[in-house]
Amino acid sequence: MIVLGIESSCDDCCAAIVEDGVKILSNIKLSQKEHKKYYGVVPEIASRLHTEFIMSVCQKAITNAQIHASEIDLIAVTSKPGLIGSLIVGINFAKGLSIALKKPLICIDHILGHLYAPLMTIKIEYPFLSLILSGGHTILAKQNDFDDIEILGRTLDDACGEAFDKVAKHYKMGFPGGPNIEKLAKCGNQYAFNFPITIFDKKENRYDFSYSGLKTACIHQLEKFKDKNENITNNNIAASFQRVAFENLIIPIKRAIKDTNIKKLIISGGVASNLYLREKIKNLEVETYYPPIDLCTDNGAMIAGIGYLMYLKYGASPIETDANSRIENYKYTKGAKL
């Protein structure tokens, strides 16, 4: 089955052609550079640019896959969660294409896409632990099947990648913050600043994460530099922030490994490409897997891949399905299933 996957939940305009859920025939992504000067994604600009480029991105995906549009068997599109304007552009385009080509439509949860992405290139048996690290999500889950996912922990405030972006913005390190902080940290002292590590000891929160305290402490350090008329040491700030940001992850992961006795961990999302994080994870007594870099960040291939499996099991989505910027809160509580 040939599936066109469309992903437009944030600022990346993505489309891919995937055969039978795993064979990637094309994977096109157009990143919007217009947001860099704002040090963050501007929703209105993102949706306008999606409107401008989504057709050409899909056309390129079809051309690169060396197929004709009529050969598409299924259209999969991200419908939630994300920026509502961006989601609407993607889902409305997918609906129009579905009607024009007379092909079924399947609406996909963006998080399910990230959880499935590593399985397109990695052979691993269920169950296993999954960690999603991105600008919008920080989620630790136990996967029993592609559609049977138990949320163990999640961020209670800022996502990991979001904290990177906000710190980078205040220190004018550039956008996106993740790769810029990682680069600066290589020349810094990671123990120059003792930023707080937030760990929850209550049973119901033992796998949860928090980044608001770390982010605030890091930003307040900038004010201390100014008050004392000291030089701002971006390299040391980046190194210290990065160290603590990932130490915040390690303890909940260790707890999950011990409590579930599962020794397999998949890490996906844009932050998963950070090499410092990968070195820290090596110290855990667990088999660790990462998708290729192009599948770590937002992409259409993961939407097409999981769309194929969801369609085979559940059938097509109603054409009336709307975009939804958020998932219901219960989806993120301990023990909930996506």
Swiss-Prot record:
Subcellular localization(s) per the UniProt record: Cytoplasm
InterPro entries: ATPase_NBD, Gcp-like_dom, KAE1/TsaD, Peptidase_M22_CS, TsaD
Annotated GO biological process: tRNA threonylcarbamoyladenosine modification
Disulfide pairings: none
UniProt keywords, alphabetically: Acyltransferase, Cytoplasm, Iron, Metal-binding, Transferase, tRNA processing
Catalytic activity: L-threonylcarbamoyladenylate + adenosine(37) in tRNA = N(6)-L-threonylcarbamoyladenosine(37) in tRNA + AMP + H(+)
Any GO CC annotation of this UniProt entry: cytoplasm
Record text on cofactor binding: Binds 1 Fe(2+) ion per subunit.
Binding site for Fe cation: 110, 114, 298
Enzyme Commission number: 2.3.1.234
Gene Ontology MF terms: iron ion binding; N(6)-L-threonylcarbamoyladenine synthase activity
Names of required cofactors: Fe(2+)
CDD domains the record matches: ASKHA_NBD_TsaD_bac
Binding-site residues, substrate: 132-136, 165, 178, 274
Similarity comment: Belongs to the KAE1 / TsaD family.
PANTHER family per UniProt: TRNA N6-ADENOSINE THREONYLCARBAMOYLTRANSFERASE, TRNA N6-ADENOSINE THREONYLCARBAMOYLTRANSFERASE, MITOCHONDRIAL
Function: Required for the formation of a threonylcarbamoyl group on adenosine at position 37 (t(6)A37) in tRNAs that read codons beginning with adenine. Is involved in the transfer of the threonylcarbamoyl moiety of threonylcarbamoyl-AMP (TC-AMP) to the N6 group of A37, together with TsaE and TsaB. TsaD likely plays a direct catalytic role in this reaction.
Protein name per the record: tRNA N6-adenosine threonylcarbamoyltransferase
Provenance organism: Borrelia hermsii (strain HS1 / DAH)
